[in-house]
């Protein structure tokens, strides 16, 4: 039986690290595509050299030719530019829209049966770009955000409680930005609600630090952003889809009335399996949680409205 195939478009820090993590899981052969001549080829060869020591034996190929993504089961879009000094939000939106649109066109042409994971920022809006450009079914296009935000939340909780990271289960909904919605009421340590383990002031501080988690890393790096945890999040999603693991995790998906939200990509809990988004889970949110989610949705909607002023899908 042929091994599954993952193609990663954009071989910068997130894309290349995601390729490495997926290789270590030995769940698929990997193609990395980037417009930078020689970079993907070098990284692919470096990964292959590490295989005998790290215990993986998969095909890893680097290319500048988008036709090499043909017949991929999964396509990951990490290509995009970070915001530079002097660049306003709309300029960044236009630049990354063009990049993601180009990637999505190649996916639709060469890998029409693939499931798509979008990583490029602004995440929730770029999901709309990929979805509209590919014309794929909604279950086959999703964004990586909630898993990353939730794992940051889990880490901060574990640090405060002093427990094992794996004992913490957490859920973060909403857009991938300052208005994300960490849910303390759905966060537990070995089944015990964190509200029984931590004071409200501590929980509030953790929630705020989670919202600023990416910015905190950018503040330290000065000239870059996080990539190990985002790449690990991509690898978790890839494994769930390619092995049909039925993982329940928050992802940016297209809502059609769930949570009272229409026609918008936003982070909610879903079941991931071989068909992509196999089920959207509707949590019983209280009034304050729902208000926060609606506020987050409004922020995403503003970005989509900005997109609609210039975007032509095909």
What do these predicted regions represent?
Residues 134-139, 149-287, 291-314:
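C-terminal substrate-binding/catalytic lobe of Rossmann-fold NAD(P)-dependent dehydrogenases
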Residues 11-12:
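Glycine-rich Rossmann-fold phosphate-binding loop(s) that bind the pyrophosphate
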Residues 88-154:
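Rossmann-like NAD(P)(H) cofactor-binding subdomain of soluble oxidoreductases
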Residues 24-29, 135-137:
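Conserved S-adenosyl-L-methionine
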Residues 15-16:
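N-terminal Rossmann-fold NAD(P) dinucleotide-binding loop
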Residues 33-72, 301-312:
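Conserved N-terminal Rossmann-fold NAD(P) cofactor-binding segment
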Residues 53-114:
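Rossmann-like NAD(P)-binding element
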């Amino acid at each position: 039986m042929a091994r599954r195939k993952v193609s990663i478009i954009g071989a910068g820090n997130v894309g290349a690290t995601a390729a490495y993590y997926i290789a270590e899981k030995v769940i698929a052969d990997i193609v990395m595509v980037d417009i930078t001549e020689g970079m993907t080829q070098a990284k692919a060869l470096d990964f292959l050299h590490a295989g005998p020591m790290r215990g993986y034996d998969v095909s890893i190929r680097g290319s500048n030719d988008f036709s090499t993504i043909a017949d991929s089961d999964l396509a990951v879009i990490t290509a995009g530019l970070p915001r530079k000094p002097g660049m306003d939000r709309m300029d960044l939106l236009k630049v990354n829209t063009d990049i993601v649109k180009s990637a999505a066109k190649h996916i639709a042409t060469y890998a029409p049966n693939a499931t798509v994971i979008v990583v490029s920022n602004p995440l929730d809006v770029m999901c709309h770009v990929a979805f509209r450009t590919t014309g794929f079914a909604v279950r086959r296009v999703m964004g990586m955000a909630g898993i990353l935000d939730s794992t940051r939340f889990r880490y901060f909780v574990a640090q405060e409680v002093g427990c094992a990271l794996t004992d913490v289960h957490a859920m973060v909904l909403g857009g991938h930005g300052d208005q994300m919605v960490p849910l303390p009421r759905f966060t537990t340590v070995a089944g015990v609600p964190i509200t029984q383990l931590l004071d409200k002031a501590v929980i509030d501080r953790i929630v705020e630090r989670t919202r600023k988690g990416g910015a905190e890393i950018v503040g330290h790096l000065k000239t870059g952003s996080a990539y190990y945890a985002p790449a690990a999040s991509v690898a978790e999603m890839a494994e769930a889809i390619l092995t049909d693991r039925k993982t329940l995790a928050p992802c940016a998906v297209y809502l059609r009335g769930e949570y009272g939200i229409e026609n918008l990509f936003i982070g909610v809990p879903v079941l991931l399996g071989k068909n992509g988004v196999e089920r959207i889970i509707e949590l019983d949110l209280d009034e304050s949680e729902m208000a926060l989610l609606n506020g987050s949705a409004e922020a995403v909607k503003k970005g989509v409205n900005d997109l609609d002023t210039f975007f032509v899908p095909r």
